[in-house]
Design a protein with these regions (language model features):
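Kelch-like beta-propeller repeat domains
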Residues: 1-239
């Protein structure tokens, strides 16, 4: 439920829950076997301090949360969404994207909203746009391939309606701070299109799900299992 990153010989840990929610950031040094508390509060259920979008500041910090999506890029750690607290005292699904720079010990709010339960702005499929943003969600799977980050699924908000399971695929470019909707429906609760076993097809798409597992191999994105809010899947998908 907490978020972990690895850069060099250090591991970074943020947030999580024990029925209350945390926003403390810790660093563990594998060389010295020591922990360091870097940022955030030692009090639970804290709201985020967003500051100005795109501007790093010592006062910025994400709100307490769990089940966020994460990746690393250019020796910085990134945090997207999750279930937690916005800039107020309200808890819900988030779609904010944050960058933490270990060199400065500062957070930067990059994109998304400082509110909860925001709907997605998908734009046109396969067309990058500065106005695009995935809907708020928890448990989406994020992986980086060739300096681009890919986000699949989770449980949250599509372009309309209430909370549901998602099966949209997004690309985020850290160099431009722009999102692109690549595949999958822009609505929630959709069944998948499996096609023929082992055969790639443009019409194929995994069913909507969350709590899935993902990894990369040879510049491909793999998704395994997950749940539609009940029985669990045991399918493996390659993108």
């Amino acid at each position: 439920s907490l978020m972990l990153w690895n850069i060099g010989n250090k591991i970074y840990m943020f947030g999580g829950t024990n029925f209350d929610y945390f926003n403390d950031l810790w660093e563990y040094d594998l060389t010295t076997n020591n922990w360091t508390w870097l940022r955030g509060s030692n009090i639970v259920n804290q709201s985020g301090v967003y500051g100005i979008k795109g501007v790093s500041a010592a006062t910025n910090t994400p709100g307490a949360r769990w089940l966020s999506s994460t990746f690393t890029y250019n020796n910085k750690i990134y945090l997207f969404g999750g279930d937690g607290y916005n800039s107020g005292s309200t808890r819900g699904q988030l779609n904010d994207l944050w960058e933490y720079d270990p060199a400065t010990n500062n957070w930067t709010w990059l994109s998304g909203d400082d509110a909860i339960n925001s709907l997605g702005i998908h734009g046109t499929i396969a067309v990058p746009s500065a106005t695009n943003i995935p809907g708020a969600r928890q448990s989406g799977q994020m992986q980086i391939i060739n300096n681009k980050t890919y986000l699949f699924g989770g449980r949250g908000f599509a372009i309309s309606g209430g909370i549901s399971n998602l099966n949209d695929m997004w690309e985020y470019d850290p160099a431009t701070n722009i999102w692109t909707w690549l595949k999958g429906p822009n609505t929630g609760g959709n069944a998948g299109v499996a096609g023929a076993y082992g055969i790639e097809n443009a019409a194929n798409n995994p069913s909507a799900r969350y709590y899935e597992t993902s990894w990369t191999l040879n510049n491909k994105f793999y998704v395994f299992s997950g749940t539609p809010f009940g029985p669990e899947y045991n399918d493996v998908w390659e993108y």
